[in-house]
UniProtKB/Swiss-Prot annotation:
It comes from the Eukaryota. It comes from Phalaenopsis aphrodite subsp. formosana (Moth orchid). InterPro entries: Ribosomal_uS14, Ribosomal_uS14_bac/plastid, Ribosomal_uS14_CS. It is found in: Plastid, Chloroplast. One of its GO terms (molecular function) is structural constituent of ribosome. Binds 16S rRNA, required for the assembly of 30S particles. Part of the 30S ribosomal subunit. This is Small ribosomal subunit protein uS14c. Keywords: Chloroplast, Plastid, Ribonucleoprotein, Ribosomal protein, RNA-binding, rRNA-binding.
Amino acid sequence: MARKSLIQREKKRQKLEQKYYWIRQSLKKEISKVPSLREQWKIHGKLQSSPRNSAPIRLHRRCFLTGRPRANYRDFGLSGHILREMVHACLLPGATRSSW
């Protein structure tokens, strides 16, 4: 189980990303529209002055049960470890164990 402080930090990043999403998108569009390089640099400076954690690349997908940041399956929102346990216990409808 991930530490609670790490999970809270991730939630804080998600809020920041949502808050600055449209600002960042508008600045990116401006950069593509402006022909002069100096103007692009000025706009890029504005983009860089936004908080570091507002960038979507800083977000990490986590298991919603354990908070584990690795080996997550997007379809279920679970880590592979928990997914396997739930499939074995028949808690996920439609998911079956493979056998050959």
